[in-house]
UniProtKB/Swiss-Prot annotation:
Compositionally biased intervals (Basic and acidic residues): 9-33
Region (Disordered): 1-92, 167-216
Superkingdom to which the source organism belongs: Viruses
InterPro entries: Herpes_UL95
Keyword check for rRNA-binding: no
Function text: Participates in the expression of late viral mRNAs. Expressed before viral DNA replication, UL95 assembles at the viral pre-replication complexes (pre-RCs) containing the early viral protein UL44.
UniProt entry keywords in alphabetical sequence: Early protein, Host nucleus
Biased composition (Low complexity): 50-82
One of the record's GO cellular component terms: host cell nucleus
Lineage per the UniProt record: Viruses, Duplodnaviria, Heunggongvirae, Peploviricota, Herviviricetes
Pfam families hit by this protein: Herpes_UL95
Protein name, UniProt field: Protein UL95
Length: 533
């Protein structure tokens, strides 16, 4: 027995010496290198690119001391399958970390020939795999690239949970009409105590209503005493917290021939009119860009370059009125900007709806459009104050003159060419490609956004339609008239009204004095329009 124990101890000692020799040889052959790591499960797993040019997915165990309890890593070869795969030292990573120190060291070497192309390709593959892993974990979130003081990059996403509408459950225990067994026991006890104390008659106690147990925590609409009202309250749908989809609907139904059906009025105010006709929307776009890049506001399928998207929407070549007889050509020598819905001229409340509708307008307006090649004259043009490119100090890439005469109308008169810098053309082309890739091959409501008409031309067409309806006695019309709320001085006495039979509703077609509105416009040097009414 003693001899067998001595032999086993000697065998274990020889094995330990062999492991030490193999470890020292491996350390001298392969120096340690930096890794590209991406967290895939909130600290429980990691995707790592080791020095052996492989991508290793490992899972951290609860007990790090026990080697048998740790999960075996799964290797994904990047370039050479024959390369040995080593698991990282520590698999617990709390953030999505992409280290670029190895790339900087290779590129900073003095001889250019020493920079291996295969090493750069392997690094790019590892970074792409890290991005794919992060997107697989959070497919509906957008990641923001932040550089750390250690020359690393973090992929940060929103960690705050999304709000979800909670539907209150209407049951017998929380309502005041029906009572459960516990309520019956309490009522019996109260009745006995009341009879003992001699309080009130039996008829009064029968007419007394029983209150719910948690009256303070119960919503007001659940404390209704009528049974029918409680059923009606349970059937009422709760308002949604945020609207992710946008759809325009005008007419709901037609009951009989001869009825005029109108959609909701398009209400604008004086501030909306001034901003819609101004070619300089820098302040408005800056306010949008100040909050739009906050993680969690947009989805991963939205356009990343929001600044270039808003440039195309507010002051791009296809963002002006397409009518040959636009009032802006006579007033300023350049057509007015096309009219957009009211939400584009107000502070943004729902960024998801705002961005989806903006991408839809850009997709419809620039369908089949390609930017011309840059000319030397356009290269040397400095541009003005950013004409809607916004962005503050770093928005010079999309700079353009903000005056109304900055655009140049071609001979055909169908579009406006603006002096663009060559740096901005690449960004605009990428945005158009991303928007077309999102909406191409899909059925989208293109008819609401297909019209490129300014506000004054839309009011002129509305006046003509109003008079045509009165003359021809149209049978059924689906139309949403424009109403300017605080410009009563521009409304004429000619107003078409229709009283629907059997109802007290009156549908009005307001007729505006377009000439008075045009005379009240004043343009300053910054491209801002003021309506003096």
């Amino acid at each position: 027995m003693m001899a067998a124990a001595v032999v086993r101890a000697e065998v274990r000692r020889q094995r330990r010496e062999e492991r030490k020799k193999m470890a020292s040889a491996r350390t001298t052959e392969d120096p340690p290198e930096n890794h590209v790591v991406a967290d895939v499960a909130c600290g429980t797993g990691a995707v790592t690119r080791s020095s052996s040019s492989s991508l290793v997915v490992s899972s951290s165990s609860a007990s790090g001391s026990d080697e048998s309890s740790s999960a075996s890593p799964l290797s994904f070869p990047v370039s050479s399958p024959s390369t040995a795969v080593r698991s990282p030292g520590s698999a617990g990573v709390s953030t999505s970390l992409c280290s670029v120190e190895r790339m900087v060291e290779l590129s900073a070497q003095s001889p250019a020939a020493d920079f291996s192309v295969s090493e750069a390709w392997r690094f790019e593959e590892a970074v792409n795999m890290a991005l794919v892993a992060c997107e697989a974990v959070s497919p509906y979130d957008r990641f923001r690239l932040i550089e750390t003081p250690d020359e690393n990059f973090l992929l940060v996403t929103n960690v705050i949970p999304r709000e979800s509408a909670e539907v209150p459950v209407l049951d017998s225990s929380s309502s005041g009409g029906d009572s459960g067994p516990e309520d019956k026991k309490k009522n019996v006890g109260n009745k006995t105590a009341g009879e003992k104390n001699g309080g009130g008659s039996r008829a009064k106690r029968r007419r007394r209503r029983r209150a719910p147990k948690n009256d303070a925590a119960t919503p007001s609409f659940l404390r209704r005493h009528d049974v029918l009202e409680r059923f009606a309250a349970a059937a009422e749908p709760l308002p949604s917290l945020c609207v992710h989809d946008y759809a325009l609907r005008n007419a709901d139904r037609v009951t009989y021939d001869g009825e005029l059906i109108y959609g909701s009025y398009l209400l604008y105010r004086k501030a909306h009119v001034e901003l819609s006709l101004s070619s300089n929307k820098v302040q408005h776009v800056e306010a949008v860009l100040r909050q739009v890049y906050t993680p969690g506001l947009l989805d991963h399928h939205n356009v990343c370059d929001v600044e270039a998207l808003l440039w195309l929407l507010y002051c791009g070549p296809r963002s002006f009125c397409a009518r040959d007889t636009c009032f802006g050509r006579e007033k300023n020598g350049c057509p007015f900007p096309a009219l957009l819905p009211k939400l584009f001229y107000e502070p943004v409340r729902d960024y998801m709806t705002y961005m989806n509708l903006a991408e839809l307008y850009v997709f419809v307006w620039y369908r089949g459009y390609e930017f011309p090649a840059p000319t030397p004259q356009a290269t040397t043009a400095g541009g003005g104050g950013g004409g809607g490119s916004g962005g503050g100090g770093g928005a010079g890439a999309c700079a353009v003159e903000t005056s109304a005469s900055a655009g140049r109308v071609d001979d055909a008169g169908d579009e406006v060419h603006l002096p663009l810098k060559p740096v901005s053309l690449d960004r605009l082309r990428e945005v158009l490609q991303a928007v077309r890739g999102r909406f191409s091959g899909r059925e989208v409501p293109a008819w609401p956004a297909s019209s490129r008409t300014c506000l004054l031309c839309a009011l002129y067409s509305q006046n003509r339609l109003c008079l045509d309806l009165a003359r021809d006695e149209a049978r059924t019309v689906s139309y949403s008239p424009i109403v300017i709320q605080d410009c009563a001085a521009a409304v004429t006495d000619v107003t078409l009204s229709h009283i629907l039979p059997g109802q007290s509703t009156v549908s009005l077609f307001p007729v505006y004095h377009v000439g008075k509105l045009l005379d009240a416009l004043s343009l300053n040097d910054a491209g801002l329009i003021t309506l003096n009414l």
